[in-house]
């Protein structure tokens, strides 16, 4: 059986990029042995736990936003390809509105439209800003997932539908047993790319008061009050987002090659 050469892409990366490995190793050695001599690096080490907690907040928001957006997007995408116009029209309106709305506007909208507390029975439950940001990011995520889902369905050759109908399969059986398994493989690369974009979009959360990585970096910069530290800490913020999103991008490229002719 032939083996797809693209499957070995992640394993062959170190052999094809020795220069990058040397550069990363040199940078790591500089941080380990040279950083403690500098007060700027010492301050960065002191703030590192707080930065890690803040970045954890960004990751939590991104995971919840893509989860909610994916579930809602699959439902909207299924409605968008429905033969009934009464269900297809609202789904397409949703997709067009939230795909073309600025994310910052949606975040401000959800922040100020939803209350600070929810009254359930005799209890008041806090409705924190980070949850509102999650909803604000889940809305465009759902529209993009719906469009990805619709595009994946449209990429399935029509001959498969015709062959299935000739075997007396119902539309529901064709959809569940034949179309959906192929769709999910085709959806995976763009879905992962969308998640990386959502993760970078969580940087907007600090604008509405969420204590995330950006907000922590701002507090640290104002507290230490050194120009070199300000440059270093925002470079560290950039490095954290890059270190989290770049592997997702590489895996996405690998999956695109893997399923290119599936």
What are these regions (language model features)?
Residues 1-262:
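Transmembrane alpha-helices and adjacent helix-loop boundaries
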């Amino acid at each position: 059986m032939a083996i797809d050469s693209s499957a070995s892409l992640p394993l062959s990366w170190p052999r094809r990029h020795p220069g990058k490995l040397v550069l990363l190793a040199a940078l790591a050695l500089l941080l380990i042995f040279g950083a403690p001599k500098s007060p700027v690096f010492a301050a960065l080490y002191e703030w590192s736990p707080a930065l890690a907690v803040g970045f954890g907040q960004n990751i939590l928001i991104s995971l919840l936003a893509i989860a909610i957006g994916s579930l809602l997007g699959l439902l909207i995408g299924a409605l968008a390809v429905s033969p009934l116009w009464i269900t297809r029209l609202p789904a397409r309106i949703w997709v067009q509105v939230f795909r073309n709305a600025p994310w910052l506007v949606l975040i401000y909208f959800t922040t100020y439209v939803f209350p600070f507390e929810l009254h359930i029975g005799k209890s008041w439950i806090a409705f924190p800003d980070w949850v509102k940001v999650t909803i604000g990011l889940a809305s465009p995520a759902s529209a993009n997932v719906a469009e990805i889902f619709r595009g994946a369905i449209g990429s399935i050759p029509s001959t498969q539908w015709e062959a299935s109908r000739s075997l007396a399969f119902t539309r529901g059986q064709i959809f569940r047993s034949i179309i959906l398994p192929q769709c999910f493989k085709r959806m995976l690369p763009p879905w992962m790319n969308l998640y990386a974009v959502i993760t970078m979009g969580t940087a907007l959360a600090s604008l509405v008061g969420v204590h995330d990585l950006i907000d922590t970096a701002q507090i640290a910069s104002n507290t230490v009050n050194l120009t070199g530290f300000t440059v270093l800490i925002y470079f560290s913020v950039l490095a954290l987002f890059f270190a989290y999103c770049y592997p997702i991008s590489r895996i996405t490229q690998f999956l695109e090659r893997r399923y290119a002719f599936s």
